[in-house]
Regions:
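N-terminal organellar transit peptides
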Residues: 1-383
């Protein structure tokens, strides 16, 4: 255990995090080893941080063939494959933005140190805005495999996504984990789809204080802080945490938790009490259980989601409400939703039967009724 670089250690563990506890411990372990002069290999860092991918950047897929297409220029202008292998314009694409690994506001600034194992909310924001503003992008899919991360920047990104509802379909594809801060962001999307075996949740916020005062004393080391300002060095790791400091930290944690649960309730179309007293107590739930609890809308793979989205016909119009946007297509496993003739979708979202997947679910009145019944049942269970 190190007693070096106290401010670096404090910056990591004491600030509020919306992340699974094992991942925060992994981050702290990296800091500890670095402070002790132990260098980690790239593979070791990757294992601790999670995915090693260029995160927060949009990957584009043709909305007619689902082939991945290239990006030309700084805006989203795409070229596909023409005859003889020559470039051919692609009229409509689906933008898939990856949110992998640990989330931080400026994670891109440390990519050169530890590899692209995290996701920057700022980078996701830029990619999202570009995709939203480009007429060639018919839908946006945020693909999640993240344990969460630091709370900073998460609420801003979630608000940006939520405000964009109704402009074009925005889908969260959980492939295979959206925990804590990742779920905060996902809940702002029109729809949450969980891949089979995937997990969502871990709604909560926490901080960590590590008291190494006795360890330092055992090593014959004493630290004396010279500071101005009553609370300037409050919570440092070389002194036990006082009751006053604990209360201040708890108040901050509670405030972030209120923001978190309020945003989730808004995004999922339920009451805050449904979240706080129900699925928002910190547990992670698996695919179909999450759907049953109202944490997600359906279970499907990324490929299935892309095919379904490709078969949708979108039109511009005023922002739709939570019950009439993508949720208009009920979960495929819903037993009490008999098929009926398709009707106009008030959100402007329709299904075209001559594209890719003729079996894709259509937006029907009974589908909407089934979704509302599930939502009412969820509200009834949770008071």
């Amino acid at each position: 255990m190190t007693i070096r670089f106290p401010h670096l250690h404090a910056a990591i563990v004491q600030h509020p995090w919306a992340i699974t506890p094992d991942r925060l411990q992994a981050i702290a372990e990296v800091v500890e080893r670095r402070a002790e002069g132990i260098r980690l290999s790239a593979s070791e860092i990757a294992a601790l941080k999670g995915e090693r991918e260029p995160n927060g950047v949009a990957t584009l897929f043709s909305a007619t063939t689902l082939d991945q297409v290239g990006v030309v220029g700084q805006q989203i202008s795409v070229l596909g494959r023409g005859e003889g292998g020559s470039p051919a314009p692609v009229a409509s694409v689906i933008a898939v933005i990856s949110v992998f690994g640990i989330i931080a506001q400026h994670a891109s600034e440390v990519d050169d140190i530890s590899g692209p194992g995290g996701t920057s909310t700022e980078r996701v924001m830029r990619s999202f805005r570009n995709a939203l503003g480009d007429a060639s992008v018919k839908a946006i899919v945020l693909r999640f495999n993240s344990p969460g991360g630091n709370v900073h920047g998460v609420q801003v990104l979630a608000n940006e996504i939520f405000k964009a509802r109704g402009q074009k379909p925005i889908i969260a594809q959980v492939d295979s984990l959206a925990a804590s801060a990742a779920y905060w962001i996902a809940s702002a999307c029109d729809e949450i789809v969980v891949t089979p075996g995937g997990q969502v949740g871990s709604i909560g916020v926490y901080g960590l204080h590590r008291d190494v005062s006795k360890a330092a004393e055992a090593q014959g080391v004493k630290f004396t802080f010279v500071s101005a300002g009553k609370y300037k060095v409050e919570g440092n790791q070389y002194e036990p945490l006082t009751d006053e400091a604990t209360q201040a930290l708890q108040a901050q944690i509670d405030d972030y938790y209120r923001d978190f649960t309020t945003d989730v309730a808004r995004g999922r179309g339920v009451k805050v009490s449904d979240v706080v007293g129900g699925f928002g107590e910190g547990r992670v739930e698996k695919d179909r259980v999450a759907v049953k609890l109202g944490m997600a809308d359906r279970v499907a793979t990324l490929d299935e989601t892309l095919r379904r989205v490709a078969s949708m016909k979108t039109s511009s119009g005023p922002r739709a409400d939570h019950d009439t946007i993508l949720h208009a297509t009920a979960d495929a496993t819903e037993p009490d939703a008999p098929p009926s003739p398709p009707v106009d979708n008030p959100s402007g979202l329709q299904v075209s039967g001559n594209l890719l997947d003729a079996s894709a679910p259509s937006a029907t009145e009974s589908d909407r009724d089934a979704f509302r019944r599930r939502r009412h049942a969820h509200r009834s269970r949770n008071g």
